[in-house]
Design a protein with these regions (language model features):
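Polar low-complexity intrinsically disordered regions
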Residues: 1-2, 11, 175, 306
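N-terminal single-pass transmembrane signal-anchor helix
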Residues: 3-42, 48
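Surface-exposed loop/linker segments characteristic of extracytoplasmic
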Residues: 38-319
């Protein structure tokens, strides 16, 4: 019987090389499929948030508001001293003056808290312990391309923000969801530019000096409410004292992952912008419940109109 010879070294190397080439060809395709699935999940998350806002509108007669800063009255007595510190300011974690009615007690909390009953999270909504709520991770709040749904800095987070309009100034009411007390709650009839022409929620850009770190924001998704954690704008940013404006690039930007944040001349850039970890663009859910993508460098004027609910202008171009 003639024995079959084994692989020679050259034959083995050729087989290994062929396998390596096949892996090299297939890996990008697998990565594209994974990213497409992540982008679809992100789109579905936005659809759910849009539907939740609509259900909230049907129940209450208006969209949720964006809440207030932690140091806005009424202030919990435990943080009065901190709020007097100019370096503490609006970036404090919010507390609330205790009352017996949870929704009233948490009126300065973010829109994300008030949509909880409409995304099958009513058990979190009715939880009486504030700390437990602040640490309740909601998967719908997370884009799988951006970060995992888990606690960061011992707080629950969110990767989506409400459309606050042209800026995050306290007095601004040009968007759909803005600071509680700045104006009356927004109703469908207030969106005179058309619900199919106005952004409701969009993906958030990462704060650039936090690239390569475990989290990009320092507070819970639920409190304080009026904060860049849960609201973003089209045009201007706020300095840390909440008053001075900083011009932005007028549109969403891509989060290009880097490990050296020192290359950025302005680490605060991205603090109040929309943006995305997807390569194809930033996704928004509109006030009519539809989801659309916006490229990273849209026409500045058109994008500003897209974030304004009643300026009487037409979206007369592709962005």
């Amino acid at each position: 019987v003639r024995l079959r010879s084994a692989f020679t070294l050259i034959e083995l190397l050729v087989v290994i090389a062929i396998i390596a080439v096949l892996i090299g060809l297939l890996l990008p395709a697998v990565q594209k499929v994974r990213e497409a699935a992540a982008r679809m999940q992100c789109s579905n998350n936005l659809k759910q948030l849009g539907l939740a806002a609509h259900n909230s509108h049907d129940t209450l007669g208006h969209f949720p508001s964006a809440g207030k800063n932690g140091c806005e009255a009424p202030v919990h007595p435990n943080i009065v001293a901190n709020c007097a510190d100019p370096n503490y300011g609006q970036w404090t974690a919010a507390y609330t003056v205790p009352t017996s009615n949870l929704p009233i007690r948490r009126q300065e909390w973010s829109w994300a808290y008030f949509v909880l009953p409409y995304i099958e999270q009513n058990n979190v909504f009715v939880t009486t312990n504030d700390t437990t709520v602040r640490r309740s991770v909601v998967k719908t709040f997370h884009c799988p391309s951006r970060r995992q749904a888990q606690l960061y800095n011992n707080n629950a987070k969110i990767d989506y923000a409400a459309n606050a309009g042209q800026s995050l100034a306290d007095s601004n009411t040009s968007g759909v969801i803005f600071r509680t007390g700045a104006g009356g709650p927004v109703r469908m009839t207030d969106i005179t530019d058309g619900t199919s022409n106005t952004a409701l929620f969009g993906e958030k850009r990462m704060k650039l000096d936090k690239f390569g770190q475990s989290y990009d924001d320092n507070e819970s998704v639920f409190s304080p409410g009026w904060d860049s954690e849960v609201a973003r704008a089209a045009v201007t940013d706020l300095d840390t004292n909440g008053t001075a404006g900083r011009p932005l690039s007028w549109g969403p930007n891509q989060d290009i992952r880097v490990t050296n944040p020192s290359i950025f001349t302005d680490p605060e850039s991205g603090l109040s912008q929309f943006g995305s970890s997807h390569a194809s663009g930033c996704q928004f859910v509109l006030c009519d419940g539809s989801v659309r993508g916006v490229r990273f460098n849209p026409d500045r004027v058109i994008f500003r109109r897209f974030c304004t609910k009643a300026d009487g202008q037409v979206l007369n171009g592709d962005f």
